[in-house]
C-alpha cells in the first residue's frame, strides 16, 4: 500500500508540478524610467528615501512586489523599493568588466569600434546566445553578454 501511494505521489509531481516553478525565483530586469528616481526603504511613499538615482535607463533586478511598488537591486547591490511608475521595460545593461570591446559584428574577429569602461550604460537592441547589439553615446556595435549586468 505504501509503495502504491509513493508511486502515485511521484507521478502527481511529475505531471502536475513544473520543476521550473519549484526552483525559479521569478526575478527579472527592468530599467529606471526617469532621470531622477527615489529608492525607498519600504513599499510605500511613507518610507524614507535611501538613494536618489540620477541615471535614466539604469537596469535594476526586480526581486519582489507589493501593491504598486517593486523591490529592486542595482548592480552595486543596493536594494529597496520603487514605485512601478518609475520603471520601464526598455532593455539596458551596465558594463561590469574593467574594459569591454565593442565590435562591429557579433564575432571577436570583426573590427573593434570602441573600448567601453566599467560602469558604462548601454541600451540593448537585441541579443543572441553570447552577444548583444548595443548603443552607447555615438557608438553602435556588439558586445559579449558576459561583460554586462542587466540580462538574464
Residue ranges of model-derived segments:
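Extended hydrophobic/Leu-rich segments
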Residues: 2, 19-22
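Bacterial N-terminal signal peptides
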Residues: 8-17
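SH3-family beta-barrel domains
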Residues: 21-41, 51-56, 63-138, 145-152
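Second-shell loop/turn segments in exported
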Residues: 43-47
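Bacterial N-terminal signal peptides that target proteins for export
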Residues: 1-9
